[in-house]
């Protein structure tokens, strides 16, 4: 099977035949996070730490990374101010807390409580590996966390340990149950399949999730590993994921509008072994995120702020804008607004580039790994 790693025809608000707008943001635009291609960022991904307690093979080397010094990471007060500007001045409507692993930040509960007090209606979710979540889930819920996405790539200790380089499967499973008990739902599970490692577990993972009324989302591995070991061959593509699941289940595409959501969702029915036909009952849903083979860049609504306060308009951005440095220099909120707007205005069309995709010779893997950006 050949997968074209290009960018599909973009459904943008402006006339793409004219090329992108000038790289300087024109005067008179609304006070929103707009870019040259007509997209508006309303979904903020905020990394609260670069540290992590796992060493996933598709993310970082076995010996870990050089962590940021404590003084380089945003304080709780700085986070409150930056999020406040995003929500109150720039049209941010959703906030996702990321890492590294956010649970390793000691004041995480206090950070979320402060954000909730200032923004009572803001959906605040978190992406986590789940290690230690069972001990903090209730406190996080009480502080104002809405829901969680938990990364889980295998249900087998040996495979899990191979992928994460840590024997913590039991801790992650306890974290899943803790999140469910605390009401941090809907709980979603993110899984990355690696060829020859855990790809044959796809049906088992889905069965496990369906039994717990959890939405499982399979994500194509992206070239964001610190050791730069990503290859097209090693990536399990969306069509392959669909085929792996179809041996045991019938997947029926959810026709509802995705509205910028990355996952293509499917209703799941059991496949009868004898007839191959679908059963009459929908068991739940599964999502497939084809971030490489079928990218959704044209509908992207995300703006990212790293743990040290750098704005990244895209996971693959080659440019970063130092929002925290400007804040610490004594800048007024109006100056921070302008920098953030300028940073998003030059957001590339797709995968860090304006014209081509991951299959292009122009593509350059960013210096940051996923753990240093925030998922």
Label each residue range with its predicted role:
Residues 3-12, 20-99, 103-123:
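Conserved alpha-helical substructure of the radical SAM core
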Residues 55, 59, 105, 158, ...:
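Residues that scaffold the ATP/ADP-binding catalytic core of kinase and kinase-like folds
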Residues 76, 80-97, 101, 105-219:
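Radical SAM/AdoMet-radical enzyme domain recognition
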Residues 54, 157-158, 295, 321:
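Glycine-centered loop/turn positions within well-structured domains
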Residues 5, 10-11, 158-161, 166-286, ...:
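Radical SAM enzyme [4Fe-4S]-AdoMet core and its adjacent flexible, acidic
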Residues 46, 76, 166-169, 199, ...:
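Electropositive phosphate-/nucleotide-binding environments in soluble metabolic enzymes
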Residues 1-34, 274-284, 293-375:
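Radical SAM enzyme core and accessory elements
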Residues 63-67, 155-157, 223-226, 321:
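A short, flexible beta-alpha/helix-coil linker loop
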């Amino acid at each position: 099977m050949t997968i074209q790693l290009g960018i599909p025809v973009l459904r943008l608000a402006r006339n793409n035949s004219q090329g992108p707008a000038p790289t300087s943001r024109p005067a008179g635009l609304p006070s929103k996070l707009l870019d040259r291609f007509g997209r508006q960022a309303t979904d903020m991904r905020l990394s609260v730490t670069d540290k992590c307690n796992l060493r996933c093979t598709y993310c970082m080397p076995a010996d870990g990374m050089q962590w940021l010094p404590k003084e380089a990471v945003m304080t709780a007060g700085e986070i409150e101010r930056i999020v406040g500007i995003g929500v109150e001045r720039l049209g941010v409507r959703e906030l996702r807390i990321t890492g590294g692993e956010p649970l390793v930040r000691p004041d995480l509960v206090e950070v979320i409580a402060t954000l909730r007090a200032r923004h009572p209606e803001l959906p605040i979710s978190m992406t986590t590996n789940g290690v230690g979540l069972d001990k903090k889930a209730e406190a996080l819920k009480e502080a104002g966390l809405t829901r969680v996405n938990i990364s889980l790539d295998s249900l087998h200790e040996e495979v899990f340990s191979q992928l994460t380089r840590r024997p913590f499967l039991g801790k992650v499973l306890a974290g899943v149950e803790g999140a469910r008990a605390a009401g941090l739902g809907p709980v979603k599970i993110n899984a990355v399949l690696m060829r020859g490692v855990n790809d044959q577990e796809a049906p088992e993972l889905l069965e496990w999730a369906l039994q717990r009324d959890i939405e499982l989302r399979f994500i194509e591995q992206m070239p964001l590993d610190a050791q730069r070991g990503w290859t097209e061959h090693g990536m399990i593509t969306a069509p392959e994921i669909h085929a792996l699941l179809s041996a045991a289940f019938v997947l029926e595409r959810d026709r509802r509008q995705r509205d910028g959501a990355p996952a293509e969702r499917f209703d799941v029915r059991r496949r009868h072994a004898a007839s191959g036909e679908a059963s009459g009952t929908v068991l739940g849903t599964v999502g497939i995120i084809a971030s490489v083979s079928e990218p959704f860049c044209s509908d992207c609504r995300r703006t990212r702020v790293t743990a040290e306060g750098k704005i990244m308009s895209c996971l693959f951005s080659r440019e970063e804008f130092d929002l925290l440095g400007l804040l610490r220099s004594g800048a007024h909120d109006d100056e921070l607004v302008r920098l953030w707007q300028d940073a998003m205005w030059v957001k590339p069309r797709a995968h860090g580039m304006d014209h081509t995709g991951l299959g292009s010779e122009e593509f350059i893997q960013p210096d940051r790994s996923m753990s240093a950006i925030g998922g």
